[in-house]
Amino acid sequence: NLYQFGNMIKCTIPKRLSWRSFVDYGCYCGKGGSGTPV
């Protein structure tokens, strides 16, 4: 859900990055940075 997605983002990227930076960055989700790119 949206709450879990928000927590996932917080755990995955540095706080200095904005939402726009996150979208451009294309982060990998999951422990150790592994998983499916978003």
Curated annotation (Swiss-Prot):
This is Phospholipase A2 2. Its EC number is 3.1.1.4. It is found in: Secreted. Ca(2+) binds at residues 28, 30, 32. Pfam families: Phospholip_A2_1. Belongs to the phospholipase A2 family. Group I subfamily. GO terms for cellular component: extracellular region.
